């Protein structure tokens, strides 16, 4: 745990030439370096081997699905996931001595990254009226303060129960049970913030607000569009699925304002060709559009589909599905 406050880490950013491939051996070394900096080698190994396994724990790094049991890799996670899970499993601890040393005004000037790197809390802390430091507080008093706030509301619906999307299933179940017993279903989470609009639109157009395909569907798709997102950054395990698509003869079209290294070439870190070979080119085509140009692109594609359907009725559009 560092005792000196560090400010915005963006001050240390360096601009380097763009990469032309992603993952490979560097992803393995970076993940292990970070993980071993958080906890012991034994704890690191036990944690990593349990990620996304049938009797293990879900990786909190992203929402990319796991293959069916029996088809999963022993290491069913990416560099981001390894860092993420060991960030949660860290052995670092923030004690009352830390808060005695650092005033709230000091901590306010620290970066989020630095604050997170100090470790996990060991007991409840409170800021007293007029106080300059967080102070330790007993659990009974802490729960009493929360109860007093809830009792002071005119209606249960004035309360909102928002927690991290990284919360485990058991804790999430208890939270929603508590909120409903209190009298409200105001239980938003990060999925509302990320996918409320897409879920609403998909419900109106497709009848369901979430994806309806399986990983096997992606593996055997003839064509996959990757639009407006960077799988190498957002959910790198998608690259292994796209690699499988390519090896089964499918094509991938990337639509974005900037090319991403992961969609240019993917070096699978659990395969020899990924560690010592050239890896697999992912995107067959890169459609370079301006920011906000995706709507115009799909309007043009829809027009071409309609023209092709007019030229050969019944051979382009799935009328039964529509």
Regions found by a protein language model. Name each.
Residues 1-65:
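Intrinsically disordered, low-structural-confidence terminal and linker regions
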Residues 59, 84-136, 143, 156-158, ...:
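Low-complexity, highly charged intrinsically disordered N-terminal segments
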Residues 93-109, 115-116, 120, 249, ...:
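Long, well-ordered, tryptophan-enriched scaffold segments
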Residues 120-131, 196-199, 220-222, 281:
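Gly-rich Lys/Arg/Thr-decorated short loops/hinges at beta-loop-alpha junctions or inter-strand turns
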Residues 140-159, 213-222, 245-248:
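Glycine-rich phosphate/diphosphate-binding loops that line cofactor/substrate pockets in enzymes
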Residues 158-220:
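Anionic-ligand anchoring segments at beta-strand to alpha-helix junctions in alpha/beta enzyme folds, i.e.
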Residues 170, 213-264:
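A conserved hydrophobic secondary-structure block that centers on an alpha-helix together
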Residues 171-178, 199-203, 236-239, 263-269, ...:
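Short acidic, glycine/serine/threonine-rich loops at helix termini
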